[in-house]
Curated annotation (Swiss-Prot):
Pfam families: LRR_6 (PF13516), LRR_8 (PF13855), LRRNT (PF01462)
Compartment list: Secreted, Extracellular space, Extracellular matrix
Name this protein carries in UniProt: Keratocan
Glycosylation sites recorded in the entry for this protein: 94, 168, 223, 261, 299
LRR repeats: 73-94, 97-118, 123-143, 144-165, 168-188, 194-214, 215-236, 239-259, 264-283, 284-305
Gene that this polypeptide is encoded by: KERA
Source taxon at top rank: Eukaryota
Family: Belongs to the small leucine-rich proteoglycan (SLRP) family. SLRP class II subfamily.
Keywords: Disulfide bond, Extracellular matrix, Glycoprotein, Leucine-rich repeat, Proteoglycan, Repeat, Secreted, Signal
Function: Plays an important role in generating and maintaining a transparent matrix within the corneal stroma.
Domain LRRNT: 34-72
Tissue expression: Cornea.
Amino acid sequence: MMTLKVCPSLLLLFLVHSVWTRTVRQVYNELDPEHWSHYTFECPQECFCPPSFPNALYCDNKGLKEIPAIPARIWYLYLQNNLIETISEKPFVNATHLRWINLNKNKITNNGIESGVLSKLKRLLYLFLEDNELEEVPAPLPVGLEQLRLARNKISRIPEGVFSNLENLTMLDLHQNNLLDSALQSDTFQGLNSLMQLNIAKNSLKKMPLSIPANTLQLFLDNNSIEVIPENYFSAIPKVTFLRLNYNKLSDEGIPPNGFNVSSILDLQLSHNQLTKIPPINAHLEHLHLDHNRIKSVNGTQICPVSIAVAEDYGLYGNIPRLRYLRLDGNEIQPPIPLDIMICFQLLQAVVI
């Protein structure tokens, strides 16, 4: 009999990833009521209502300029790729079961969102407003939200307390907006006690954001202008597992001696920065991306989380450093790979130079 061993970190990645990649059908199967027969099967003429999926309404890619009246039976509403500018209360009067709204790629502005219309959708779990014309995070929001996607808008402001009641939110995506450091205050993310993924990539940040929720597992800060990691910054987010800081302005001087020596971090991405040496890492780290920096040499003795002698004595089954993937291309390093790297990181499966 063959025994399959699953790496704990890969299992964690699978579990975290599954939270955000469930299909609509899977969510439907979990939440589907036992009987839909008491609802009439009306369908707006602009939309498509699949008989096999009676609580879904597909109005995407129809050139719509306004939201049609939503039947009471609908849980999943697809309105992406239209010309919609406003979200008013009238179309949602009967839509008391809505769980999922996709309004990506429209022309919605903050002024176009009627006051209180979103917060009245008491059962809404997933709200997609990517690729619109928003200049601030809309408020108030439904208190039961689990995912809020606001990428690729023009957001430069986050109203005070807008997230304070969103205790169930697990994912917040604000990437590719116009956020400055001043938009992220110490209490901006207060109340997001369940948050697992925070994406603030492709904004205009120069500093690490303040007061990241303590339960955050994935933090994406790529494509900003961050220069410094504050001392003990990650002690406030002790569960962070995946950290992306690619395409910033980090230098050796901007990283404290043990800035990334945090036991929870399994995947660390620092590509396209200004580093000349490899920063200290923890023994649990499995993936390290340092490509396209200014690194000229690699000293395994210096970067090994344990002494080389100890690593050599541990052997294959010992408590050795867990690094499996190391990317160093785009630097000034020439092959071959130093022997002390291989002695220290005995689980390495790939080194890209």
